[in-house]
């Protein structure tokens, strides 16, 4: 008997949905006998053979976990007091187990379909209420990417809204976190904004500025009274943004109460691990008058068709996918998973618990300061919350080294000063250890538990916080566990059903890939810890850069961008800097096809480029002659082309090499958007067929989960001539050009992609692309008799997604794409992407992870819906009172008085398979218009649910 003794590549079958016999059946239905034959027919001849992965065989799950455990073990976990916007904290175990490690939470998509997203929408509304309460400003968004990005958004927000229209100068306090100032400078330069960094205490004339950023408390620890300064800025028609520590705001006067127009910051210390810099949820709050100019997503309270309260994403017409180059921001994701952790941290601790944590931290800091002063050490701050700057003079290096020898990290402010930041994990023993470092042999002070607060009396908070019942109920673990379960049960995520969203790649996020994320070796490392302490992360990132270079054909990778939008931005900045280095600053025209995702033109605008739109032909491809004409017309100013490949229409355009050649011949660079990379890995490589730069979505192609709307990771790959212009960071060799706060962005979720690639190997990655193409074509073929497939390649095939045209059905029956999307909920499915890239269509991307059984279940649902539409067309079903117009149907409606002309069974059990397991939407169809006309973006009163 021959026994296979190797475990190589065994994970591939776990990741890929269809079994071998199903694969053959699906291929046969398309007229092919192998995946290679299908691939050869789909991939254009001109780009075949451009991908040679060169990766080893896939490791087994056990082998990969053992290998990454060894890598993680190279990180050294010192006791860290660096601060600078990053603080160690405790992630409560019920939140860790029931939210962060729960696929019901981390595999969900952005809540664009509110009826199946009420759970995470409620958690996000809690987050917005938390931020609004603590900052004293009435409107808060559902999170941004990090504090530095939020500061950059605040700067451009102030520029748009300031009445000081003649000004291009923005004041930024020198007491801001250094990484924030770096990101501000990066964002400002292409927009022609002059960032003036200075000490606000020395400002005599503020009339030159359209806005200002102040840090509260300051990065060095000082707590300044900004009331008078804020009034001065307002008198000069400037707006004021305050970067505030959320935990400190439980004790300090909130920014909104001293006149701030915007508050921004990080919610990281609300239960989210350091993670070597991310991901963390930033926040952004502002005055009600400015709500329509606020960046990011906003959860609002509306009603469903029964008049019951229901939540939804509000004011979506602000978002970049709609406003394109006129958008106020290019950000198209939030940090939902992290915002929800912070939200539940506040729910679990409540107002008293949060205040006690803040008081304890402040008291320990005051005790530390008193003891250091007694030891003869000069403390610079009179008023502080949790951070001290110590004037250590000539002893700075000696004291720093002494601390390091005891596995303690202090912040090196400069050659003569050290910083110490106390956090939730600091103990009395830690304070005494710090005293010993500075004692130089002197007797240690007695630990006095009662030391007077050093916060200014005039700035002590008087207003209450978190009075809503949700923050005052779930304080036992039992209650919180059940609350999290109740919310999760309201939502549809990948743990229940396929999510066939086109352009979103909702594939499996395997359990083995997720396990390392919550290891302390990855989670407890400060992003500015010395390099020798982060050897594991440096190996991980080096490995990952090599893997992604192999997958894309590029020469270098930057892992810093912490979202696809930031990857786009970093890519265009690299192109811009390249042209500038050649003395061609005039090159500022960016060509973008009309079919492009709205992020593309929004990003080009942010990068200081002018957008020129090129046409698409009747088949959805780039009109090459129109592109050629516009490239020639703008050849002296052409900077770049942004193009998605395969196209947003779901096909491999055959002219891609010619398109790239046209741009290069006219002096431009080619940016290939990697949103659809899941169709290409192992089959063709953008860096080999004409791309100069691409961003990748690790949260799509490379298995990082969507988290209900973030986190994402958007690294960029570049050819060698663009390598010098990759994002830099103060903690890296290249200092300029940071696009986010941490040097490696959302570093703590990079192990997910490392695990995926290591377990799939070269053969598995190629097979995943082939199965993604097979699954999409199988759906396309099964449904084409019922719904027109809008675009195909010249051979009648699609890439990894297909677009169904529902516009004729609207004309014949009055049934809209929205009706079909909502009816799919009754069948237990998340809808495909609606009305993008073409209005009135559904774009379906099944991914390689879905089995034939699940694909058939979806196709059966779509066919059954088509039969219902046909019944409307022929009059069997009423044109207004039918299962589609009334979808989705709730359990409450089922047991209530039934007045519809169709049966209860048809409403909620339209196919027999649902009897085995039925998802019940918690609300009926949500009224979008009501929600925007009656905007409420904080927790409503309990009475409203009566």
Curated annotation (Swiss-Prot):
Pfam families: GcvP2_C, GDC-P. GO terms for cellular component: cytosol; glycine cleavage complex. GO terms for molecular function: glycine binding; glycine dehydrogenase (decarboxylating) activity; pyridoxal phosphate binding. It catalyses: N(6)-[(R)-lipoyl]-L-lysyl-[glycine-cleavage complex H protein] + glycine + H(+) = N(6)-[(R)-S(8)-aminomethyldihydrolipoyl]-L-lysyl-[glycine-cleavage complex H protein] + CO2. Its cofactor is pyridoxal 5'-phosphate. It is an enzyme of class 1 (oxidoreductase). Keywords: Oxidoreductase, Pyridoxal phosphate. The modification N6-(pyridoxal phosphate)lysine is found at residue 700. It comes from the Bacteria. One of its GO terms (biological process) is glycine decarboxylation via glycine cleavage system. Its EC number is 1.4.4.2. The glycine cleavage system is composed of four proteins: P, T, L and H. The glycine cleavage system catalyzes the degradation of glycine. The P protein binds the alpha-amino group of glycine through its pyridoxal phosphate cofactor; CO(2) is released and the remaining methylamine moiety is then transferred to the lipoamide cofactor of the H protein. Belongs to the GcvP family. NCBIfam families: gcvP, PRK04366.1. This is Glycine dehydrogenase (decarboxylating). It comes from Pseudomonas fluorescens (strain SBW25).
């Amino acid at each position: 008997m021959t026994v296979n003794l190797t475990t190589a590549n065994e994970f591939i079958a776990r990741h890929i949905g269809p079994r071998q016999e199903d694969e053959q059946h699906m291929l046969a239905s398309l007229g092919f006998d192998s995946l290679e034959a299908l691939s050869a027919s789909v991939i254009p001849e001109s780009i075949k053979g451009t991908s040679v992965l060169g990766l080893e065989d896939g490791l087994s799950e056990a082998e990969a976990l053992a290998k990454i455990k060894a890598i993680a073990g190279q990180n050294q976990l010192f006791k860290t007091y660096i601060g600078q916007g990053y603080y160690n904290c405790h992630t409560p175990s019920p939140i860790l187990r029931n939210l962060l490690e729960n696929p019901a939470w981390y595999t969900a998509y952005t809540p664009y379909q509110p009826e199946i997203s009420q759970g995470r929408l409620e958690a996000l509304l809690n987050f917005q209420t938390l931020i609004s309460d603590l900052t004293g400003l009435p409107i808060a968004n559902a999170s941004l990417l990090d504090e530095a990005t939020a500061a950059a958004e605040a700067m451009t927000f102030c520029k748009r809204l300031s009445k000081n229209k003649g000004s291009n100068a923005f004041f930024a306090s020198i007491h801001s976190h250094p990484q924030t100032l770096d990101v501000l400078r990066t964002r400002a330069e292409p927009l022609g904004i002059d960032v003036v960094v200075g000490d606000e205490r020395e400002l005599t004339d503020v009339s030159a500025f359209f806005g200002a950023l102040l840090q509260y408390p300051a990065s060095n620890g000082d707590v300044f009274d900004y009331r008078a300064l804020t009034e001065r800025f307002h008198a000069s028609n400037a707006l004021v943004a305050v970067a505030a520590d959320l935990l400190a705001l439980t004790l300090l006067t909130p920014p909104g109460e001293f006149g701030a127009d915007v508050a921004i910051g990080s919610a990281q210390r609300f239960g989210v691990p350091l993670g070597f810099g991310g991901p963390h949820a930033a926040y952004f709050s502002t005055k009600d008058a400015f709500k329509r100019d606020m960046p990011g997503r906003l959860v609002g309270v509306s009603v469903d068709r029964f008049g019951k309260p229901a939540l939804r994403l509000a004011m979506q017409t602000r978002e970049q996918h709609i406003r394109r180059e006129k958008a106020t921001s290019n950000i198209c994701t939030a940090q939902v998973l992290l915002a929800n952790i912070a939200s539940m941290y506040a729910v679990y601790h409540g107002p008293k618990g949060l205040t006690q944590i803040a008081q304890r931290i402040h008291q320990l800091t005051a005790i530390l300061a008193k003891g250091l002063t007694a030891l003869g050490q000069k403390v610079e701050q009179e008023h502080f919350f949790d951070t001290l700057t110590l004037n250590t003079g000539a002893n700075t290096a000696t004291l720093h080294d002494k601390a390091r020898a005891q596995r303690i990290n202090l912040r090196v402010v400069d050659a003569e000063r050290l910083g110490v930041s106390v956090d939730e994990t600091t103990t009395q023993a830690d304070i005494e250890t710090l005293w010993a470092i500075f004692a130089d042999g002197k007797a240690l002070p007695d630990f006095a538990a009662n030391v007077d607060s050093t916060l200014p009396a005039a700035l002590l908070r008087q207003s209450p916080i978190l009075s809503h019942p949700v923050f005052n109920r779930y304080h036992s673990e039992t209650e919180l566990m059940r609350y999290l379960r109740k919310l999760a049960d309201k939502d549809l995520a990948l743990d229940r059903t396929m999510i066939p969203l086109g352009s979103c790649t909702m594939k499996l996020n395997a359990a083995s890939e997720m396990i390392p994320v919550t290891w302390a070796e990855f989670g407890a490392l400060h992003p500015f810890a010395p390099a020798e302490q982060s050897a594991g992360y440096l190996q991980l990132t080096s490995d990952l850069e090599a893997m992604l270079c192999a997958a894309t054909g590029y020469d270098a990778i930057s892992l810093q961008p912490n979202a696809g939008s930031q990857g786009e931005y970093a890519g265009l900045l690299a192109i811009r800097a390249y042209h500038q280095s050649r003395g061609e600053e005039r090159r500022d025209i960016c060509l973008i096809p009309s079919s492009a995702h709205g992020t593309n033109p929004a990003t080009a605008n942010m990068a200081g480029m002018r957008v020129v739109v090129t046409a698409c032909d009747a088949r959805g491809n780039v009109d090459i002659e129109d592109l050629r004409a516009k490239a020639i017309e703008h050849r002296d100013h052409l900077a770049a082309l942004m193009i998605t490949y395969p196209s947003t229409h779901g096909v491999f355009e055959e002219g891609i090499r010619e398109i790239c050649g046209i741009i290069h011949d006219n002096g431009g660079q080619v940016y290939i958007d990697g949103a659809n990379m899941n169709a290409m890995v192992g089959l063709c490589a953008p860096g080999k067929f004409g791309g100069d730069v691409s961003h990748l979505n690790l949260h799509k192609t490379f298995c990082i989960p969507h988290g209900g709307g973030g986190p994402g990771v958007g690294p960029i790959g570049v050819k060698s001539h663009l390598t010098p212009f990759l994002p830099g960071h103060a903690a890296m060799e290249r200092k300029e050009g940071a696009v986010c706060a941490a040097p490696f962005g959302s570093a703590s979720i990079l192990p997910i992609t490392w695990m995926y690639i290591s377990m799939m190997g070269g053969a598995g990655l190629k097979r995943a692309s082939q199965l993604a193409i097979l699954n999409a074509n199988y759906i396309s073929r099964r449904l084409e008799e019922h719904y027109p497939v809008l675009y195909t390649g010249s051979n009648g095939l699609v890439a990894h997604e297909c677009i169904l045209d529902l516009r004729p059905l609207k004309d014949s029956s009055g049934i809209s794409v929205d009706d079909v999307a909502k009816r799919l909920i009754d069948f237990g499915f998340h809808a495909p992407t609606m009305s993008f890239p073409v209005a009135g269509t559904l774009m379906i991307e099944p991914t390689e992870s879905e089995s034939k059984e699940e694909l058939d279940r979806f196709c059966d649902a779509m066919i059954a819906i088509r039969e219902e539409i046909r019944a409307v067309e022929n009059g069997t079903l009423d044109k207004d009172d039918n299962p589609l117009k009334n979808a989705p149907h709730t359990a409450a409606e089922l047991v209530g008085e039934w007045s519809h002309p169709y049966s209860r069974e048809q409403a909620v059990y339209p196919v027999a398979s649902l009897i085995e397991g039925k998802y019940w939407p918690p609300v009926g169809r949500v009224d979008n218009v009501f929600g925007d006309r009656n905007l409420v973006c904080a927790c409503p009163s309990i009475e409203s649910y009566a």
